[in-house]
Amino acid sequence: MKIGIIGSGVVGPVLATAFLKEGHDVMLGSRSIDKKELVKWKNENETGSVGTFKDAAQFGEILILATGGSVTESAVRLAGVENFANKTVIDTTNPIAQTPPVNGVLKYFTNVNESLGEKIQQLIPEANVVKAFNSVGNALMYKPDFEGIKPTMFICGNNEEAKKTVTSILDSFGWETEDMGKIEAARAIEPLCMLWCIPGIAKGQWSHAFKLLKK
């Protein structure tokens, strides 16, 4: 598949490399194609391509939003709302506010009755937004190693076929997937990032993931 990734910070390049390893065609999009991190990624991944947000959005059959939450909506507009139509859009973002954590707890710019995932779906109504990859750090997004135990990735979205596609991707990346329903479930999934970050911010412990136990 052709994968267009919008965002070249700490998440985008990791996912771009992962998709290349899985045999996909990948374009990593950035606000600035001269960004040194983007040039470095291209030099290390010759089969991948780079471009602007708009280039990546036009290129991809599946699109990945991997920007900071506070700039995601502006990134979508730069990429061109029309370029998201009828595509599966994996939303990895979290609505993290630009203020320091309090006792290890991140602040969000959304309230409990809304989510960034919903805002994105409203901005690109013809796209099939699926929230995923937001509840774990970038180092564990691809082939996480927990001694044979698959961690759980919680997803949500309005389109069933899009969620099946994302579930297949997550399976190839080494994850167990739990579908939490429609996009409104992002109100519950996004705060998992807060919980995941507390051990890291407070104790420097970042090598963990969530697991849903069932019987």
Question: Across the structure, where does each feature detected by a protein language model lie?
Answer:
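NAD(P)+-binding Rossmann beta1-loop-alpha1 motif at the extreme N-terminus of oxidoreductases
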Residues: 1-42
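Short, well-ordered alpha-helix to beta-strand connector turns
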Residues: 23, 59-61, 127
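General beta-strand structural signal in soluble alpha/beta enzymes
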Residues: 50, 90, 128-134, 178-180
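Short beta->alpha connector loops
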Residues: 68-71, 135-137, 159-160
